């Protein structure tokens, strides 16, 4: 293999690592605009520092990382799963007593 081809392959591999799956947004990430959350989610700006999520997840499901939480009959959102408070980002708590799956939320769920 020529050294030029080797350089191209190494460069392509590094670019894939830098801009590939390791940099994709996950449920619960902070955001400012919808594009911060990739193509499967949107930025819920009512949450502190934004929150990447999917609305109506009972119908369409959540991305690989996330749990679907029903807040009432008409509202369900993909939320960041947790076990303890330190699993959540700053300013968020792990809600453990609202539905079957603990999740990170800015305030205790009603």
Q: What residue spans do the PLM features occupy?
A:
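Sec-dependent bacterial lipoprotein signal peptides
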Residues: 1-21
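Secreted, cysteine-rich disulfide-bonded mini-domains of extracellular proteins
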Residues: 22-110
